Amino acid sequence: MPELPEVETVRKGLEKLVVGKTIQEVIVFWPRIIESPEVDVFQGQLAGQTIEGIERRGKFLIFKLSDNDMISHLRMEGKYEFHQADDEIAKHTHVMFTFTDGTQLRYLDVRKFGRMTLVPKNQGHQYKGILALGPEPTPDVFQLATFQQGLKKHHKAIKPLLLDQKLVTGLGNIYVDEALWQAQIHPEQPADSLKPAEVATLYQAIIDVLARAVEAGGTTIRTYLNALGEAGTFQVALNVYGQTGLPCNRCGTPIVKTKVAQRGTHYCPQCQQLKGRRLK
């Protein structure tokens, strides 16, 4: 699943490719991609609108249009590709935006889980899925004191708590594993058991890991490519995710893989020891 660094990289690429272009026509091959309004209304409303900008909130893309905001979530395998209108249409292409200059933005999704929604202009940040998100993982809005207070309220394991997007947004499976490894915290450690120094270390690790991943253009594990068709490079810097059986870069102990909250989870059994009772 594209996480914050991948979605931010897609946003930057799309900004270069389609901002300023006017939509001539929208073709929808898989109607379920369109959450609302009805497909024919979606197509009709977009025709003639100009893309004025592209924003991101968590893992959501917000296309700023002349008359609406269009919200897009890539979910598991969604991606955008930029084409000439006469280019061959690839398998798994579900939505095509044709511009007045003869170029196209195409949405492809092997799993068909991605969704698009039209909302009134400048109301993208009021969308229900976006309103539920925690702060972005940057020091100006992600505050250590608030993060610490939030963790104290939860006895659940730290990994699923970080994945639910309410304390801080943008973390998915890859970057939670990486941040917990950097902070030397076991993924099943109860959140309310973390000491202030551990919370501070984790807070900084979240900011650091995501910032470095954005700079690297994200992580390409399977199918992720940015809007320019380029792979991310952060996979070469992964310390724990996907490193099962390889020596820990900090202590040399083999990395292990387990399941936490039904998610494949990687950690170092030496550096990230569970303190106290294991949560179920």
UniProtKB/Swiss-Prot annotation:
<keyword id="KW-0511">Multifunctional enzyme</keyword>
<dbReference type="GO" id="GO:0006284">
    <property type="term" value="P:base-excision repair"/>
</dbReference>
<dbReference type="InterPro" id="IPR015886">
    <property type="entry name" value="DNA_glyclase/AP_lyase_DNA-bd"/>
</dbReference>
<feature type="active site" description="Proton donor; for beta-elimination activity">
    <location>
        <position position="59"/>
    </location>
</feature>
<dbReference type="Pfam" id="PF06827">
    <property type="entry name" value="zf-FPG_IleRS"/>
</dbReference>
<dbReference type="GO" id="GO:0003684">
    <property type="term" value="F:damaged DNA binding"/>
</dbReference>
<feature type="active site" description="Schiff-base intermediate with DNA">
    <location>
        <position position="2"/>
    </location>
</feature>
<keyword id="KW-0227">DNA damage</keyword>
<dbReference type="InterPro" id="IPR020629">
    <property type="entry name" value="Formamido-pyr_DNA_Glyclase"/>
</dbReference>
<comment type="function">
    <text>Involved in base excision repair of DNA damaged by oxidation or by mutagenic agents. Acts as a DNA glycosylase that recognizes and removes damaged bases. Has a preference for oxidized purines, such as 7,8-dihydro-8-oxoguanine (8-oxoG). Has AP (apurinic/apyrimidinic) lyase activity and introduces nicks in the DNA strand. Cleaves the DNA backbone by beta-delta elimination to generate a single-strand break at the site of the removed base with both 3'- and 5'-phosphates.</text>
</comment>
<feature type="zinc finger region" description="FPG-type">
    <location>
        <begin position="239"/>
        <end position="273"/>
    </location>
</feature>
<keyword id="KW-0863">Zinc-finger</keyword>
<keyword id="KW-0378">Hydrolase</keyword>
<comment type="similarity">
    <text>Belongs to the FPG family.</text>
</comment>
<feature type="active site" description="Proton donor; for delta-elimination activity">
    <location>
        <position position="263"/>
    </location>
</feature>
<dbReference type="InterPro" id="IPR010663">
    <property type="entry name" value="Znf_FPG/IleRS"/>
</dbReference>
<keyword id="KW-0862">Zinc</keyword>
<protein>
    <recommendedName>
        <fullName>Formamidopyrimidine-DNA glycosylase</fullName>
        <ecNumber>3.2.2.23</ecNumber>
        <ecNumber>4.2.99.18</ecNumber>
    </recommendedName>
</protein>
<dbReference type="GO" id="GO:0034039">
    <property type="term" value="F:8-oxo-7,8-dihydroguanine DNA N-glycosylase activity"/>
</dbReference>
<keyword id="KW-0479">Metal-binding</keyword>
<comment type="subunit">
    <text>Monomer.</text>
</comment>
<dbReference type="InterPro" id="IPR035937">
    <property type="entry name" value="MutM-like_N-ter"/>
</dbReference>
<dbReference type="InterPro" id="IPR012319">
    <property type="entry name" value="FPG_cat"/>
</dbReference>
<feature type="binding site">
    <location>
        <position position="92"/>
    </location>
    <ligand>
        <name>DNA</name>
    </ligand>
</feature>
<keyword id="KW-0326">Glycosidase</keyword>
<dbReference type="InterPro" id="IPR010979">
    <property type="entry name" value="Ribosomal_uS13-like_H2TH"/>
</dbReference>
<keyword id="KW-0238">DNA-binding</keyword>
<keyword id="KW-0234">DNA repair</keyword>
<dbReference type="Pfam" id="PF01149">
    <property type="entry name" value="Fapy_DNA_glyco"/>
</dbReference>
<dbReference type="InterPro" id="IPR000214">
    <property type="entry name" value="Znf_DNA_glyclase/AP_lyase"/>
</dbReference>
<feature type="active site" description="Proton donor">
    <location>
        <position position="3"/>
    </location>
</feature>
<dbReference type="GO" id="GO:0008270">
    <property type="term" value="F:zinc ion binding"/>
</dbReference>
<keyword id="KW-0456">Lyase</keyword>
<dbReference type="InterPro" id="IPR015887">
    <property type="entry name" value="DNA_glyclase_Znf_dom_DNA_BS"/>
</dbReference>
<dbReference type="Pfam" id="PF06831">
    <property type="entry name" value="H2TH"/>
</dbReference>
<dbReference type="GO" id="GO:0140078">
    <property type="term" value="F:class I DNA-(apurinic or apyrimidinic site) endonuclease activity"/>
</dbReference>
<feature type="binding site">
    <location>
        <position position="111"/>
    </location>
    <ligand>
        <name>DNA</name>
    </ligand>
</feature>
